Amino acid sequence: HTAGKSVGNYCYTRDAVMGILLLLVKGNDGEAYTVAHPEAHITIGDMAKMVAEKQANNEIKVVFDIPESAMTFGYAPDVNMRLNSDKLQALGWKPVIGLEEMYTRMMKSMEYTR
C-alpha cells in the first residue's frame, strides 16, 4: 500500500556479527556504534525491482497498485535514512558482502532448506 520510496540500510549477517565482535574487543564503553554497510542502502521499491531482475531473472515484475483509500490505513511516511558506520570502521571493521550478493546468498539458502 505504499510506493516503496522509503530507504532502508542493510548489512550481511556475518558482517554484522564481525562488527559486534570487534566492538566487544575495541569499542568504548558508553559509546553508540552503527553496524550498517555504507553502500547497502536502497529504497524498498528499488530492492523489489533488483530482486525481480537479478534473482527472478525478470520472470516477475514489480507493480505498485496503490488504492486511494491506502492513505486512511495510517502507514508511516516515507523515510530517507542513511546510517553512518564511520565510527565502527575507524576501529577496523569493514563490511565485505554487498547488497546483491546478500540477496543471492539468502535465496540460495532458502532453496537449500526446501
Give residue ranges: language-model regions.
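C-terminal substrate-binding subdomain of Rossmann-fold SDR/epimerase-dehydratase oxidoreductases
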Residues: 1-114
